[in-house]
From Swiss-Prot:
Cited InterPro entries: Cytidylate_kin, Cytidylate_kinase_dom, P-loop_NTPase
Keyword annotations: ATP-binding, Cytoplasm, Kinase, Nucleotide-binding, Transferase
Name of the featured protein: Cytidylate kinase
EC nos: 2.7.4.25
NCBIfam families associated with the record: cmk
Enzyme class name: transferase
Similarity field: Belongs to the cytidylate kinase family. Type 1 subfamily.
Organism of derivation: Shewanella amazonensis (strain ATCC BAA-1098 / SB2B)
Domain of life: Bacteria
Amino acid sequence: MSERAPVVTIDGPSGAGKGTIAHLLAKHYGWQLLDSGAIYRVLALAALHHNVELENEEAITLLAAHLDVQFLAGGDKDAIKVVLEGEDVTGAIRTQECSNAASKVAAFPRVREALLRRQRAFCQAPGLIADGRDMGTVVFPTAPAKLYLTASAEERAQRRYNQLQDKGFDVKIDRLLAEIQERDDRDMNRPVAPLVPADDALVIDTTGIGIDDVFAQCVAHINDKLSASGF
């Protein structure tokens, strides 16, 4: 068995089911959980709170270097509590405004470098489930098991619409679809760490597939890869 803690990476676009699967896998294996997207959302929220322009790479990078963020175990409703500068921002970082802002700050190379070490520090025993967009390609390129979840833009927009409606937000599905398509284009075509599957990742299209079936595919793949890697 390796002396290092094993890492399972889960990448893919927003709304593909990464967060749900990551939480289920973390509970299944009893491992640590990293929501990489939350880190960028927290940074974006911190920028908004401190009135830092999202286009100011230097200021955002400085903010990232001193970002005070914690991930704490939550209750049944929130698998992970996200705390920024002592304040619970678990709900605040999930707004569409924060989501769009996170994608913008994540496009800056210096910002990504500033947060890279923070993300890697989450790799602790007994293991880590890392949910993000470049976990398997950049942050944990040697992870023994890698997953890439995707789904049609239309289905992802519908899922996001349902989530926001349940939380009482008044949203238009056509606007959500346009924002998702715009974000996909930005994430997939950015010059640094574009959103692409790792060469050795299992790609799962979750369009029209139940969460239980997706989870079963993931567990089977992870178990095979961990066994082959000596974990």
